[in-house]
């Protein structure tokens, strides 16, 4: 009886853990960056969205923004 109870508890813990995990985090970051053409420089507190945008415009891109910690420029 104790072994069956342990298996049921283990099964429920696995199901609960799986349902609470955020499996969309990686997929959303990949989908979001595929809309951009070049992602190079890491974004920091000192190198933010404004600096990223300026660098992208100076490099003849149409747009630029910090996405997932990287400066991504669009053609």
Swiss-Prot record:
GO CC annotations, alphabetized: extracellular region
Localisation per UniProt entry: Secreted
Signal peptide (residue range): 1-19
Primary localisation category: secreted
Annotated S-S bridges: 39-73, 43-66, 52-71, 56-72
Any one GO BP annotation for this protein: killing of cells of another organism
The entry's keywords: Antimicrobial, Disulfide bond, Fungicide, Plant defense, Secreted, Signal
Repressor found in the keyword field: no
Family, similarity comment: Belongs to the DEFL family.
The protein, known as: Putative defensin-like protein 55
